[in-house]
């Protein structure tokens, strides 16, 4: 009987903090997204954006995954796409609920020209974090590559609702509308 209490104690000692950290993380994200919507200017919005990216890019319980994500992101920025793709895939296998693993792999798939696979990964991101303005922006870019301009506009309009000051959304929507209008002529 004492062993049961010991195991329960150890479980709550180690996993209780992780559960609490996850709740705190969600509350913090909710507050940041509210601030982002209400931000008064671009520089304030950008500071909030950086805080959100920091939370997204940090795995809530596994520092090694956070480091792996950072390493694979560095590889991706160096053009080592296949290598970064494999690391992002491993991260997803280990932590399928972590939206940023999916988001980074969607990005590398986009860079590899594998647009439909990128869209599939973006869908996975949005299942886990519907406010992921990075994934929505990426979705817009993929739709542009696929010449699905109406869908791209919808993606950027969704971004604008979440992050009104994000310049890519503000710039892309009128450009895409003009492109659609010009193609209709």
Where are these regions (language model features)?
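Positively charged n-region of N-terminal signal peptides that target proteins for export
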Residues: 1-4
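Bacterial N-terminal signal peptides
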Residues: 7-14
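N-terminal leader/linker segments that initiate helical-solenoid repeat arrays
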Residues: 18-70
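TPR/TPR-like (Sel1-like) alpha-helical repeat modules
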Residues: 34-40, 144-168, 174-178
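Boundary/linker segments of alpha-helical solenoid repeat arrays
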Residues: 43-46, 60, 133-134, 163-175, ...
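Register position in tetratricopeptide repeats
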Residues: 58, 77, 111, 145-146, ...
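Alpha-helical adaptor scaffolds
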Residues: 62-129, 134
């Amino acid at each position: 009987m004492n062993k049961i209490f010991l195991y329960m104690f150890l479980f709550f000692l180690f996993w209780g903090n992780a559960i609490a950290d996850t709740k705190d993380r969600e509350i913090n994200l909710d507050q940041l997204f509210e601030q982002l919507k209400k931000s008064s200017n671009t520089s304030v919005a950008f500071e909030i954006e950086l805080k959100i990216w920091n939370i997204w890019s940090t795995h809530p319980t596994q520092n090694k995954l956070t480091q792996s994500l950072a390493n694979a992101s560095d590889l991706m920025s160096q053009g080592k796409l296949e290598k970064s793709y494999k690391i992002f895939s491993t991260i997803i296998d280990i932590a399928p609920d972590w939206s940023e693993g999916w988001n980074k792999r969607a990005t590398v798939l986009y860079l590899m020209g594998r647009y439909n696979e990128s869209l599939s990964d973006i869908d996975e991101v949005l299942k886990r974090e519907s406010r992921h303005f990075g994934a929505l922006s990426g979705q817009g870019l993929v739709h542009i590559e696929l010449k699905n301009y109406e869908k791209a506009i919808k993606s950027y309009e969704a971004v604008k609702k979440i992050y009104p000051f994000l310049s890519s959304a503000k710039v892309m929507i009128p450009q895409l509308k003009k492109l659609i209008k010009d193609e209709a002529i």
